[in-house]
Amino acid sequence: MNLAWKEIKFYKFRFILIMFIIFLMAIMVLFISGLAQGLARENISIFDQIKGNQFVVQKMKEPQLEKSILSRSKQDNISKIIDEKPFKMAGKTFKINGNEENVMAINSVKNHQPNLKSGHYPKNGNQIAINEKLTAEGLYLDDKVKVKGDDTTYKVVGILKNTMYSHSNIVMMDQSKIEQSSNVATFYVTNQLSKSDKNKINHIKGVQTATTDDITSNIASYKAEQTPLDMMIISLYIITAIVLSAFFYVMTIQKTSEIGILKAIGITTKHLLTSLILQISMITFIGVAIAEVVIFLISQILPVSMPFHIDMHNIIIVLVVFMIVGLIGTSLSFIKLIKIDPIEAIGGGQ
């Protein structure tokens, strides 16, 4: 540890430069990760909010909430098995400040209500609660809004916390207003579903159970967006490994004579390798930690309309992966350090 720290202090500029490169790479990875998570949440954040992991929907090859049509008789049969009220979902078009905004309207179901950021849930047919992203369009608490094809003027009484589905803002309104739409989807959400109940539901003609993963995997925009973004993140990790490999290999070559002298006076190869690993770990940790602080501060000032989300889970993953990538990227330096002959390094072999 002492040797590693002394070398960092002696070659300050070199190590600051490497740390700056790591910082920039970490910023890029974290920002793209934040965008990937933000876009993902615009597709599936509703599932975090409605507090359920089992769904009862219309039987179809690729279950989708907005396409689940359940007749009254099917709903009656389902209600005999599970003690849950159904969700109703329909597309609506809001008129906001002269612009049209497509949203997905859902009703309020006890124990499965999305979390509120402010205000309260609708209490009558003239009240609505909107997703927080709609505030970026100029819609706030106590504002009035019209819906295309509906004469009712709705009052905004609540702001829902990050509730979206398939890139559509979720708006909570009275069930009777949703059922006025031409295409109304119906589905059930539950936390507890025994094997026996699941079998009973699946035996109802035209009805099936599905998990959250089943639903999310069939959201077209979710699949289309995540794959290229994940590939970009992996590519950045590979580039980071290559850059660190080049930096540390060149530095090891430049220090050949010093390493030879250290070996000649009795410093073991194991000690030198430990010193190199500590150097890599320290500068990688510091560079990534600074990048994470910067990204966190940036995330606090980004507008609500920006699809960006970073949490502690992402931060820890990026830090761990960078530490591993840093060590992998400097494997060439390990090989070079092991092969350095002290006599040749100090010119004794001439």
UniProtKB/Swiss-Prot annotation:
Q: Which UniProt keywords apply?
A: Cell membrane, Membrane, Transmembrane, Transmembrane helix, Transport
The membrane-topology field of this record reads: Multi-pass membrane protein
List the PANTHER family: ABC TRANSPORTER, MEMBRANE PROTEIN, HEMIN TRANSPORT SYSTEM PERMEASE PROTEIN HRTB-RELATED
Role summary: Part of the ABC transporter complex hrt involved in hemin import. Responsible for the translocation of the substrate across the membrane.
Q: Which family does it belong to?
A: Belongs to the ABC-4 integral membrane protein family. HrtB subfamily.
InterPro entries xref list: ABC-4/HrtB_transporter, ABC3_permease_C
Q: Which GO terms describe its cellular component?
A: plasma membrane
What taxonomic ancestry is recorded?
Answer: Bacteria, Bacillati, Bacillota, Bacilli, Bacillales
Q: Which domain of life is it from?
A: Bacteria
> What is the annotated localization of this protein?
Cell membrane
Q: Give the source species.
A: Staphylococcus epidermidis (strain ATCC 12228 / FDA PCI 1200)
**Residue intervals passing through the bilayer:** 15-35, 233-253, 276-296, 315-335
Assembly and binders: The complex is composed of two ATP-binding proteins (HrtA), two transmembrane proteins (HrtB) and a solute-binding protein.
Q: What is its main location?
A: membrane
Name-wise, this protein is Putative hemin transport system permease protein HrtB
